[in-house]
Amino acid sequence: MVRALHDNRSTENTVKEILAAEGIAFCIEEKVDKASVDGYSYIEDGIPYIILTRRYDRIDNFAFALMHEVGHIYLHYLDGRRSDCKLSIPDYDNESAEEKEANAFAANALIPNEEWKNAPKVRLNPAMIQRKYTQWANEKGLNKWIVLGRISYETGMYKFRSDESRRIG
């Protein structure tokens, strides 16, 4: 599935097929007004569900949110650690141990930590960073926007020049 995310062609349909083959129900909902929810997951009657929202139409956000929810399914729900598996917005804590684990799972699934350790160490300006990391992503067969999304997530720098290839394919 990670390869399909990096290829970013017919991405939503491909992801749905891959998840269905694993017994995971998947759907995409339009953006939820006044809610900053990119996705959620739960298990009902033994069936895992992943729902993503169209909060952003960007492959980096889609890929991270998807793998974050896959992380919840495999790390927290299927191992029996959680049985309720319901999202409660008032109780939601982005800094909880489970959220941190799902974030780490997603980051490592999309760009393995061993690979990430060898990424360019450029921190000059957004244009230089974008150029160097795009070149590195191309050399590694990774989607440049997923790579730049990780840079944004880790550094808080979001000033990269966007183009049509950032949209979900």
Placement of each model-derived feature along the sequence:
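Active-site hotspot residues in diverse enzymes, especially metal/ion-binding acidic/histidine motifs
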Residues: 1-169
